[in-house]
Amino acid sequence: MAKKKSEEHSGADANDSDYTEEPNFDDPPNFVDNISDEDLLGDMLAQRPSEADGVESVVVVDNMPKVEPSRLEKLKSVINKLFSQCGEIVNVVYPVDEEGKTKGYAFMEYKTASQAEDAVKKLNNHRLDKNYTFAVNLFTDFQKYENIPEKWEPPTVQPFKVQSDLYNFINDPDAYDQYCVAAETAPNCVQVGFWQNTLPEPNELETRERFTDTFVKWSPLGTYVVTFHKPGVAIWGGSSFQKIQKFPHPGTQFVEFSPCENYLVTYGPTPTGQKIIIWDIRTGTEKRSFVGDGMSVLSMFRWSHDDKFVARMGENSIHIYETPSFYLLDLKSIKIPGIRGFSWSPTDNVIAYWVEEQNQIPARVTLMEIPKKRETRNKNLFHVADCKLHWQKSGDYLCVKVDRYSKLKKDKKELDVKFLGMFYNFEIFHMREKEIPVDSVEIRELILAFAWEPIGNKFSIIHGEPNSSNVSFYEVNKGVKPSLVKRLEKKSCTHLFWSPRGQFIVMANLTMGTFEFVDTTNDYIISASPDHFRASEVEWDPTGRYVVTGVSSWKVKEDTGFNMYTFQGRIIRRTILKNFVQFLWRPRPPTLLSEEKQKEIKKNLKKYYPVFEQKDRLRLTRASKELLEKRSQLRETFMEYRNKRIAEWKDQKSRRVMLRGHVDTDNLETDEVDEEVVEFLVKEEITLLE
């Protein structure tokens, strides 16, 4: 065996036998290595240079128009403009027949193979017009398809995987709602807990550490919860919140579900602006992508109530896409010069949009049916500075808040415009009535907030000065002008939160953390006025029975947590949670009962009262029994700990006596103790009396 010797002591040290022996890595004689190079060095061999055919960067475009030589240049211009978006085009060949007419396909060579793959991904099945849809393939795919074996072999049967029930949360016999609570445990590390709002104490369903990097969001029907991560986003669901699907979109900042949960829109930054991707939730495939400019494009896509259409606003136009193809409706945009905003009806395929004033032409609010593109109502408006569109949740009414001016002042270059003498109009469209009549309400004070009653015919506004504002409630009825039914004066509120079931409303000041609970059917009496200092959010549960106010660590760093109240403002519980971030009720899907069945249940509700009261008594009895058992168990645990410590204390008595000078201090009487009082000067003050 080889010996390791120091150069400094070679031949001079007699202790050669103390040198350490090197391990021998030689193979024994006749050794056969059973490990192949691919198994041992697979990752390195995958990177070794290989021969190339030189056609990896070539794509074949089929289903192109067959044109005469006179129209070929125009076709080339259109094709080059479209395909150059995927990379630099080196060469293009358009095969022609004997007469010089193109054959309907072309060969296109990109600078790199990755650009060719990107062209196939983005432009395959691209619809040029109603007659031509491109079929784009890599040139190398032809060789792959030529080598398909003639004998067909059936695919291997994959084992069936039972998917978790995504709707188990609505099967609870007592109809308890669920909610999630998020708290930041470390930078870019958020813990999320899922709870069931049982009585008397909530039941913890699941808690996930490092569940998301920033925050979470429920889907509109409560089926999924989405989490945010550096590579993209993921959706979770089922009884134990398993991962359902993931969507790779690095740096996603915001997501939006379609109303029926068929599609997901992700918004993420790019060097030039925002990239928006529309995904199919069930398959996880990308349906279409867009690149916005540097401006904020959050929620730039608006969905119809049935997921059949999605729309976005362009320059002097609205682009409406059909699903699932995501082609433009009728293959063209709707040209609307001067359009400034639009919104879908929450229950019908109707778009409302407004157009600004132009060249002495008044501003206009228009209702348009989709897909017919038929205008059903127009309303001209004069001296308009801005408009806001507010749909009632039931789709019965549309309110257009119009900011109007008495005088317009422009500078010399007309770059800076000032509006003087501002006042406000509310234009109410009665969507369910014949010819859609419009009523108008004028307010001469500053409007701070507006909110429709979700189920009903009332709306509320905050108007006046911010520090001493008024809250007015209006009622809308058929055939008459909207009437003022109640005005609450000198209220320092900033936001209005209606119950999802209507009738009750919370008037909130999210600056001071004050809240007022109002019953709009009982002479607008304020039932409670609780405080939650620094509260920044208000969340009604889907049934309208509970309200939660929260103090998020995004706003402040101390005293974070949430309070839960009844719909009348009675406090149920207070929860202090360090680094609390977010509280979200889980939405519920719409009921499957018909309106007639719901009316029947409401009519016979008194029959069910005894059953509900009995359940409440049993629940309270069970809760009291569980509480007593818990207290008894805690007492037994404490007594066991106490007896253990007393026995340990008795065993140490001899040691205590020895350490205390052989004096048993355990049994000292009070008369054997000397008490000494010491007084000393603490402070001296001199007060002059006049």
Swiss-Prot record:
Alphabetized SUPFAM superfamilies for the sequence: DPP6 N-terminal domain-like (SSF82171), RNA-binding domain, RBD (SSF54928)
Region (Disordered): 1-36
Keywords: Coiled coil, Cytoplasm, Initiation factor, Protein biosynthesis, Repeat, RNA-binding, WD repeat
WD repeat residue intervals: 207-246, 292-331, 334-369, 442-484, 530-575
Pfam family, one: RRM_1
Compartments it resides in: Cytoplasm
Entry coiled-coil feature ranges: 614-645
Top-level taxon: Eukaryota
Stretch forming the signal peptide: none
Domain RRM, chain residue ranges per copy: 57-141
GO biological process: follicle cell of egg chamber development; formation of cytoplasmic translation initiation complex; regulation of translational initiation
Biased segments, Basic and acidic residues type: 1-11
Acidic residues bias spans: 15-25
GO cellular component, one term: eukaryotic translation initiation factor 3 complex
Keyword Electron transport in record: no
Record-level Gene Ontology MF annotations: RNA binding; translation initiation factor activity; translation initiation factor binding
Family classification: Belongs to the eIF-3 subunit B family.
Subunit structure, as described in the record: Component of the eukaryotic translation initiation factor 3 (eIF-3) complex. The eIF-3 complex interacts with pix. Interacts with mxt.
Cited PANTHER family: EUKARYOTIC TRANSLATION INITIATION FACTOR 3 EIF3 -RELATED, EUKARYOTIC TRANSLATION INITIATION FACTOR 3 SUBUNIT B
Record's function text: RNA-binding component of the eukaryotic translation initiation factor 3 (eIF-3) complex, which is involved in protein synthesis of a specialized repertoire of mRNAs and, together with other initiation factors, stimulates binding of mRNA and methionyl-tRNAi to the 40S ribosome. The eIF-3 complex specifically targets and initiates translation of a subset of mRNAs involved in cell proliferation.
Protein name: Eukaryotic translation initiation factor 3 subunit B
Organism of origin: Drosophila virilis
Gene label: eIF3b
